[in-house]
Swiss-Prot record:
GO molecular function: GTP binding; GTPase activity; guanosine tetraphosphate binding; translation elongation factor activity
Protein name: Elongation factor Tu
Known partners and oligomeric status: Monomer.
Residue positions binding GTP: 19-26, 81-85, 136-139
Stretches for region G3: 81-84
The protein's role, per its UniProt record: GTP hydrolase that promotes the GTP-dependent binding of aminoacyl-tRNA to the A-site of ribosomes during protein biosynthesis.
Organism in which the protein naturally occurs: Rickettsia canadensis (strain McKiel)
Length: 394
């Protein structure tokens, strides 16, 4: 059967459901598809289909994730839902499921629970820009004062972790009632989607961000100069523009005198393109894999940062033993490994395989980085962890 062409008529947004186990994330995901299917905006997907999420590999880590897509009047959404708590932790840290926004599901009958807190904190750490709350299972709560109390608790918790708790939309409803086709259940789902449409901001497209290309390879072409190749991560590069070479050494300025793709000359390269960039007056030995080409002033090299990290379990091919303070593995950023030393917080003696942790890293050479940059931790060529830069320290 022929694949349907992806129609890009509406702006696209990536979202996901987060929250404590059994608070109804998967039921809500199913309910959204079933309610939107009535207006032709989705394919109705049953709970069991979503719950049997396939396993995926992201940077050597096994993650179970269910993907559904649907659309509202205004937008097209790709929605991720994970069966287990560990899958969320891995997903958010590796960026396997890049979220432009999240729907936090809280059971009105139970209120915020430990994983509710952990997911809010993780969302903040990894830079999920906005979230909307669905207060689920309201059909199980008879007392309106209790509902109000739970809503207050959720707002306080969001504010505590740096989200605007007072202004985040909280929609009360029952995913189960929506799945059963009850009008009040469906009404809440439609309200939720309106809130997601209006409150979760449209993401900035990669081409609208400053130019950045990680350097994968360097060649010298006799009579023409030095060419660096790589995949453009963001922005646009035009022939004749000034650019900087950032990371590993002192930042150098140069000019792009040519862009090539598939052996053809182009006027510009943009996000997603695999290109070769000809650099004016730059010698082959002045550039290396692991540096980046970037718009001048847009990114700086750093060697000290804080990170949120997931450490692979033994079953995932990770370490068999915990690591302690001053552990010195390799940190793989974009295209290269750099050795670094880990400093654990004072209250943490060690990090076990299968855990996630926050700690500080000091690299032996600076890397072009900004908050939100993903990396792997490697030991003797195998991946033992995955992380995201949450704060730059120098």
């Amino acid at each position: 059967m022929a694949k349907a062409k992806f129609e890009r008529t509406k702006p696209h947004v990536n979202i996901g459901t987060i929250g404590h186990v059994d608070h109804g994330k998967t039921s809500l995901t199913a309910a959204i598809t079933i309610v939107l299917a009535k207006t032709g905006g989705a394919q109705a997907t049953a709970y069991d289909q979503i719950d049997a999420a396939p396993e995926e590999k992201e940077r050597g880590i096994t993650i179970s994730t269910a993907h559904v897509e649907y659309e509202t009047k205004n937008r097209h959404y790709a929605h991720v839902d994970c069966p287990g708590h560990a899958d969320y932790v891995k997903n958010m840290i590796t960026g396997a499921a890049q979220m432009d926004g999240a729907i936090l599901v809280v059971s009105a009958a139970d209120g915020p629970m430990p994983q509710t807190r952990e997911h809010i904190l993780l969302a903040k750490q990894v830079g999920v820009p906005a979230m909307v709350v669905f207060l689920n299972k309201v059909d199980m709560v008879d007392d309106p004062d209790l509902l109000e109390l739970v809503e207050m608790e959720v707002r306080e918790l969001l504010s505590k972790y740096g989200f605007p708790g007072d202004e985040i939309p909280i929609i009360k409803g029952s995913a189960l009632q929506a799945l059963e086709g009850k009008p009040e259940g469906e009404k809440a789902i439609n309200e939720l989607m309106d809130a997601v449409d209006s409150y979760i901001p449209q993401p900035v497209r990669a081409t609208d961000k400053p130019f950045l290309m990680p350097i994968e390879d360097v060649f010298s072409i006799s009579g023409r100069g030095t060419v660096v190749t790589g995949r453009v991560e963001s922005g646009i590069i035009k022939v004749g523009e000034e650019i900087e070479i950032v990371g590993l050494k002192d930042t150098q300025k140069t000019t792009c005198t040519g862009v090539e793709m598939f052996r053809k000359l182009l006027d510009e390269g943009q996000a997603g393109d695999n290109i070769g960039v000809l650099l004016r007056g730059t010698k082959r030995e002045e550039v290396e894999r692991g540096q980046v080409l970037a718009k001048p002033g847009s990114i700086k090299p750093h060697d000290k940062f804080e990170a949120e990290v997931y450490v692979l379990s033994k079953e995932e091919g990770g370490r068999h033993t915990p690591f302690t303070n001053d552990y010195r593995p390799q940190f793989y950023f974009r295209t290269t490994d750099v050795t670094g030393t880990i400093k654990l917080p004072a209250d943490k003696q060690m990090v076990m395989p299968g855990d996630n942790a926050t700690f500080t890293v000091e690299l032996i050479k600076p890397i072009a980085m900004q908050e939100g940059l993903k990396f792997s931790i490697r030991e003797g060529g195998r991946t033992v962890g995955a992380g995201v830069v949450t704060k730059i320290n120098n």
